[in-house]
């Protein structure tokens, strides 16, 4: 078991979900998962797993698992966070992660919060930085007709996707297919 303690922050989409099982498979201890709250108000609240079938919002075998389901399957606590403030800083101090990992989060994280974990924050960005910095990199990749792209893991700073690059992996998009579906298929096969 790896001694590294990670707080994972993401959205409910597939790109946010996929890195979590990879961290767990590597033996990394994930101390918690944070997702955005539906209400953009200050504060955080812990989400409890749904146990009764009658409480499930969707009863279909075709519903794809999301980041919350994946965390609960591995008994990892999940918090919904509103606007980032003192409460998330307090949660970081309580959980004592060595690093926070982010994949597709919809809020800019303040510098004071970025400095809380010992090794800072790492972001998984679905493009080869510095190209397509900022929100919606997949949209801009497809709009530009790019067929060679990749994934970047970088340290977060107070800029938007401007931190030092830790690693990059190239990825070819299928020829003549420039849709999110083809990206998801490509990334799923890796």
Language-model segments: what does each one mean?
Residues 1-190:
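One-carbon transfer enzymes
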